[in-house]
Amino acid sequence: MNVLFVCKQNAGRSQMAQALYEGRGGNARSAGTTPASRVHPEVAELMPELADRVPKQLDTVDAEWADIVVTMGCGDACPVIPGRRYIDWDLQDPAGQDVEMVREIRNEIERRVAELPL
């Protein structure tokens, strides 16, 4: 199963989701509708393995690759590719949050990722 995780900046939620899904053995990509220049420092502090990742612009190639597209706050900017399953997760943006809030967001993402098929 190929899963694409999308948020606005690809600097927090979608990066965490990709890492957690890959940690379960799944195939994942992540992207953003308006990518940041780097992963949010708050996220990198909690998940140091993400510190060197570079946020990526969402394109239709990624959406076409995916069997499931999980969106997190990108609204109408996310492309819709016929035949793909779309799931929207209403999650807070970790940008600017303290480490405890980022941990809560990460834990919620981890819980939801565990429910996705591999």
Could you tell me what each predicted segment is?
Residues 1-118:
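Short polar/charged helix/loop
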